Amino acid sequence: MAEVPIAVPVSIRDEVVPSRKRVKLPPWLEIAKPRLIPLLLATTLGGMALSESWPLPLPRLACTLGGGALAAAAAGVLNCLWEEQLDGQMQRTSGRALPSGRLSGSQAFLIAVALACGASLLLVAGVNCLAAGLSLLGLCSYVLLYTIVLKPRTTRNIVIGGVAGAIPPLVGAAAATGHVGLGGWWLFGLVMLWTPAHFWALALLLTDDYRSVGIPMLPVVKGPEVTGRAINRYAYATVAASLLGVLTLPSGGLFYGLMVLPFNGRLLQMAQRLGELPDDKQRAKGLFRWSILYLFGICLLLLLARTTMAADFSNQLISLLTLPPASAF
């Protein structure tokens, strides 16, 4: 008798990030959520690029990015520690180091303390106290405000809790000048507006998982249609806010303004397509992935805008736009 093949269910995590693209990490590194750190460091660089002091001396740049990475890792560990029981109940997270028993809670706590202390020492000694304080604020807001207070209680958890992910630009600005100027606050606001559309796209993929443990994410409470409309609104707000970078950049603003248009067009297109069919997992996955590339792209454009080439381009364009009209004969 022929053997009947048994279908093996694909995990929700593999649907979002296929396993062939993921590398198995040791448990002490896994709980630090290292895949989230590069985008946080990119926005830190963006905050620096918006200051008059860019480029920074290499030692200060290295200390800022190193301290930021350690602080973000500490926040990730504390998040995993607090949500250990919750993670064990969800398909996507049940294999994490703590719920699977590959790492103990006491070990995780010691790792978090070491990371937080390392971040503070590096930022205080190598950068300045304001950057260190803002980094600590980001850590606390992620763990206390978002993870403990907001996430289990309200559909607005990511709207308000997104402040944690928006603090790195302030750290970058503080590292560059010792204070936070208009550019740093602009990028902070942009990341705040970007976060809901990014995260709700992921939440549409993980609705069943969140529902099973009672986490009131917007798709769980309001449904996919309402979520799709909300994603559209925040996508438009993100695009509008992104254009203000033209005014906040010390140089190269027009270069940035032109180069950001294709990024904005693609973001709006994908948000609109998801709004039309909010139950479509492929569209939700596509927007989630593009939103990550979008924010990386914004930060890259900010860095490129501060180059001599971009500054010259912007100045020449301004000259062309301000030429007096030719005299009529």
Curated annotation (Swiss-Prot):
The enzyme's E.C. designation: 2.5.1.141
GO process annotations (BP): heme O biosynthetic process
Keyword presence, Nucleotidyltransferase: no
Listed pathway(s): Porphyrin-containing compound metabolism; heme O biosynthesis; heme O from protoheme: step 1/1
An annotated GO cellular component: plasma membrane
Transmembrane segments: 61-81, 108-128, 130-150, 158-178, 186-206, 243-263, 284-304
InterPro entries linked: Protohaem_IX_farnesylTrfase, UbiA_prenyltransferase, UbiA_prenylTrfase_CS, UbiA_sf
Protein name per its UniProtKB record: Protoheme IX farnesyltransferase
Organism: Synechococcus sp. (strain RCC307)
Originating gene: ctaB
